[in-house]
């Protein structure tokens, strides 16, 4: 999409909850976004890659956000399977 000056701009792109696939609307101020950086085991420095998790306010309100983050990180291999 172009604005009045002719520059290309992006439209609003809503985020989706990583746990429930719900759309997170603009007024959901209880939602959180966690970015976990990959760390090089040899040097201990953060690599250029990271993994992002978004949890909507409804999941946080139910008190299930910690279980969702653990489940998602186990699936991605960040946490051990026997955690």
From Swiss-Prot:
Among InterPro entries, the record links this protein to:
Ribosomal_eS21, Ribosomal_eS21_CS, Ribosomal_eS21_sf
Q: Which GO terms describe its cellular component?
A: cytosol; ribonucleoprotein complex; ribosome; rough endoplasmic reticulum
Record keywords: Cytoplasm, Endoplasmic reticulum, Ribonucleoprotein, Ribosomal protein
What molecular function does GO assign, one term? structural constituent of ribosome
A family per Pfam: Ribosomal_S21e
- Record's subcellular location: Cytoplasm, Cytosol; Cytoplasm; Rough endoplasmic reticulum
Q: What GO terms describe the biological role, i.e. biological process, of this protein?
A: translation
Protein family per UniProt: Belongs to the eukaryotic ribosomal protein eS21 family.
Q: How does it assemble?
A: Component of the 40S small ribosomal subunit.
Full protein name: Small ribosomal subunit protein eS21
């Amino acid at each position: 999409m172009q604005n009045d000056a002719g520059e290309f701009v992006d439209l609003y792109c809503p985020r989706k909850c990583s746990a429930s696939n719900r759309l997170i609307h603009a007024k959901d101020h209880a939602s959180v976004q966690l970015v976990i950086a990959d760390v090089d085991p040899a040097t201990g420095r953060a690599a250029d890659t990271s993994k992002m998790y978004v949890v909507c306010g409804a999941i946080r309100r139910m008190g299930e956000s910690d279980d969702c983050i653990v489940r998602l990180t186990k699936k991605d291999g960040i946490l051990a399977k026997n955690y």
